[in-house]
């Protein structure tokens, strides 16, 4: 996991803005980060697709090591900034996508048996028209490979709607 340092003042000379440091000037973001750093919440596990923001705590008497806790994440994933927990920030390493800071989030790993996996779905394009003047939409398919799966009355109805659409 890459460590990104966030500064509200100036960035020290040994750090490089856009590489391993972000300079935050917006008061809302600074307040949210300070509030998260001062809270007594436990550290959360990190997702390998995100970068964790860690706040250093005071040194402990027993070990002389600084403890840290995760106070937020940064990501280039598609999330909308809401101004409460998700904020826009600078890009790192000339990224093509906007980077966001997510503060006060918890990471939840869903059981794979309750989610649709990439190998379990087939996405078909919606039927289209060959010419804009055609009255009917057309879909070219190969062979009779439709299988309707159902288990109850509601799913029967939804399967029938899909077959009619197809």
Swiss-Prot record:
It comes from the Bacteria. InterPro entries: Lipoprotein_10_C (IPR004890). Belongs to the MG185/MG260 family. This is Uncharacterized protein MPN_282. It comes from Mycoplasma pneumoniae (strain ATCC 29342 / M129 / Subtype 1).
